[in-house]
Amino acid sequence: MSTPIAIDINKILKLLPHRYPFLLVDRVLEISPRESITALKNVTMNEPFFQGHFPGFPMMPGVLIIEALAQTAALLTFSDERAEDAIYYFAGIDGARFKKPVLPGDQLIMTAKLERDRAGIYKFAVQATADGEIAAEANITCAVRTKGA
């Protein structure tokens, strides 16, 4: 087992192609390459999606929680470096469950565990928590391909 390391926002910006408002990972707290990752997203009232989801009771959309988890998984895949022409596709989801709303002011803690890696196809068990409670969990499949291929 390797020594866990952290990744700051500057390295995240080098590893992921996403940018505001779609970059949904603020920091990697711990990563054990090829094994698991724990990251966080500070959810603020300034998030653009809160304007319409939902007026009077803002909550983070479940699909964006899943996207944040997929970005977290991508960081596990690209923890060393990402080839300039590599793109990370979200390919599938199984068993998604949403158990707690994520609200402004929450700190979303996201974990991804690599379950399988075969021919550029990755399977992960992912989970997001807020205030120590499970907000969402799923099994996701992602693929790394060359842009335009």
Curated annotation (Swiss-Prot):
Highest taxon of source: Bacteria
Catalytic activity: a (3R)-hydroxyacyl-[ACP] = a (2E)-enoyl-[ACP] + H2O
CDD domains: FabZ
GO biological process: fatty acid biosynthetic process; lipid A biosynthetic process
E.C. numbers: 4.2.1.59
GO molecular function: (3R)-hydroxyacyl-[acyl-carrier-protein] dehydratase activity
Active site per database record: H53
A single cellular component GO annotation: cytoplasm
Coiled coil regions, renumbered to chain: none
Keyword line: Cytoplasm, Lipid A biosynthesis, Lipid biosynthesis, Lipid metabolism, Lyase
Listed InterPro entries: FabA_FabZ (IPR013114), FabZ (IPR010084), HotDog_dom_sf (IPR029069)
Location within or outside the cell: Cytoplasm
Entry's family note: Belongs to the thioester dehydratase family. FabZ subfamily.
NCBIfam families membership: fabZ (TIGR01750), PRK00006.1 (NF000582)
Protein purpose: Involved in unsaturated fatty acids biosynthesis. Catalyzes the dehydration of short chain beta-hydroxyacyl-ACPs and long chain saturated and unsaturated beta-hydroxyacyl-ACPs.
HAMAP family from the UniProt entry: FabZ
Protein's recorded name: 3-hydroxyacyl-[acyl-carrier-protein] dehydratase FabZ
Native organism: Polynucleobacter necessarius subsp. necessarius (strain STIR1)
